[in-house]
A protein has these predicted regions:
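N-terminal helix-loop segment corresponding to the beta1-alpha1 unit
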Residues: 2-179
Length: 179
């Protein structure tokens, strides 16, 4: 079955509860009246979809920190729109000092957005299972958003890619196909 057929059989998003041991916590108090004011978001995304997700969170008041790699910089063309309302920092997760600082950031965030191909952050030790462990250790849950180009099923599931390529593969641009 082609990747487009696999993707088209799935819902646009899914929600999975990774754990239910950490206590619920109230939204932070703030003078800012936007609904997500006081919510801290850590973004590891590059192109279009992930940065747009976090830009919208920032528009609703969330404090978003975008992390880029020194070996895989942000695409300048997309920075103008995709990074509005965010803070940005460069961090190398392949070094001990980078990992230490990253874990300090993780200790305080409410939302983590992973926009890399499936398994990329997990190979560095920061997949959903590890972040769930960190959340339990700090006594406060975390929302883990995992967004990728081709979905998590099918022959293309592990590939990196851009939305335009996924649209072509899945025929998302076709409104009606004659029978």
């Amino acid at each position: 079955m082609g990747q487009g057929k696999v993707i088209n059989q799935l819902p646009p998003w899914s929600v999975e509860q990774l754990e239910n041991e950490t206590p619920k916590c109230p939204f932070p108090k703030s003078d800012d009246k936007r609904v997500l004011s006081g919510i801290k978001v850590l973004e590891l995304c590059r192109i279009i979809a992930g940065p747009v997700i976090t830009r919208i969170l920032a528009e609703y008041g969330a404090d978003v920190l975008k992390i880029t790699s020194p070996s895989l910089s942000d695409v300048p063309f997309f920075q103008v729109d995709g990074n509005m309302g965010k803070h940005a920092a460069e961090l190398d997760l392949k070094t001990a000092s980078g990992r230490k600082l990253f874990e300090e950031l993780l200790a305080d965030v409410d939302v983590f957005v992973d926009g890399y191909r499936p398994g990329a952050l997990e190979s560095l030790g920061y997949g959903p299972a590890r972040l769930t462990e960190l959340a339990k250790a700090r006594g406060k849950g975390i929302v883990y958003i995992q967004e990728d180009c081709f979905g998590f099923d099918g022959e293309w599931a592990g590939r990196p890619g851009w939305q335009q390529i996924a649209d072509c593969v899945s025929l998302a641009h076709v409104k009606h196909r004659p029978s």
